[in-house]
Amino acid sequence: MSSLTGKLIVIEGLEGAGKSTAVNLVVELLSQKKISTITTREPGGTRIGEILRSIIKNPEYNNVLDDRSELLLLYAARIQLIEQVIKPALNEGQWVIADRFELSTLAYQGGGRKMDMRVINELSNFCLKGFKPDLTLYLDINPELGMIRAKSRGKFDRIEQESIEFFHRIHDTYHILVKQNPEIMMIDANRPLEDVQSSIQSVIEEFIEHNL
């Protein structure tokens, strides 16, 4: 597959939506087609990115980390990820499967933190220079159900400790973004796992068919 141009597939959604499971499923489906893949996550995916992740997610920084600082840290991590991991992999013909990307910032910082979307978009244009995923799957889940699932994983991190109203704002913003960007594929993640996986498989198989 090295002779082919790689693709970037992003999995988005609230906590507890099943993003990690979806990433693994996408990798399996691509592997069946002999497509070389790598996985990554946001924030993180590089040495610097993981350091920034530890700051952003650390509960010790509750009420300490300014929203603007958080936003800048996220973009710093994203730049490192794009330049050090994603672009090199795509240039080698690999398909990159990412747990979160730009849409998360718009939803969490723009929606959850109520930050000015114009500022975020300007920062995005400066940092990403138009770089976009080839496919985004948004796993849509009720915030209450998502947090119940997330809680079963263990202790909450700094973001997961936010109020349920915070996650409802994110959820609402995701829906607005999906309506504004019809290329984003929304999948109902409130359903049983096998139904969610079946929907993901259908989307991925169609995407593969049109890109091989």
Swiss-Prot record:
InterPro entries: P-loop_NTPase, Thymidylate_kin-like_dom, Thymidylate_kinase
Enzyme class (EC, first level): transferase
Native source organism of the sequence: Legionella pneumophila (strain Corby)
E.C. code: 2.7.4.9
CDD domains hit by this protein: TMPK
Lineage summary: Bacteria, Pseudomonadati, Pseudomonadota, Gammaproteobacteria, Legionellales
Family: Belongs to the thymidylate kinase family.
Sequence positions that bind ATP: 13-20
Entry protein name: Thymidylate kinase
